[in-house]
Design a protein with these regions (language model features):
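Short S/T/G/P-rich N-terminal loop/turn motif that feeds into the first structured element of a domain
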Residues: 1-49, 57-61, 82-106
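Short amphipathic alpha-helices in soluble, non-transmembrane regions
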Residues: 23, 62-71
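Conserved short beta-strand edge segments in small beta-sheet-based binding/regulatory domains
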Residues: 72-86
Length: 106
């Protein structure tokens, strides 16, 4: 499952969040994260935020990872399960076919 995490923290939490990010990144670099959790990309914003794309077995597993390694960041994060549309994946193609058949049966 792919999950986009939208992080938006207040300026007064910048140092705390940065320390949590360092700890989390080190955990990932040392391959000590829970099985199946992978950070695919991080895009930083200039206004105390970031967008990250994760692969995880489920939303609960990713939230538990954040509870352990980034509790302050977790409070400033919204998670969105997503599906890769381009390049197209089998899951995306199947979702389109399902949508088409659902619309056709109405």
């Amino acid at each position: 499952m792919f999950i986009v995490a939208v992080h938006e923290w207040k300026p007064e939490f910048e140092i705390t969040v940065t320390k949590e990010m360092i700890g989390g990144f080190n955990t990932l670099l040392e391959n000590k994260q829970p099985l199946g959790i992978k950070l695919l990309s991080t895009h930083m914003r200039s206004d105390h935020g970031a967008f990250c794309t994760w692969e995880a077995p489920g939303l609960g597993e990713l939230e538990n990872f954040f509870k352990k390694f980034g509790p302050t960041l977790l409070k400033a994060t919204k998670f969105y399960p997503v599906m890769q549309a381009f390049p197209a994946t089998v899951e995306y193609e199947l979702s389109l076919l399902k949508m088409i058949t659902d619309l056709a049966s109405k």
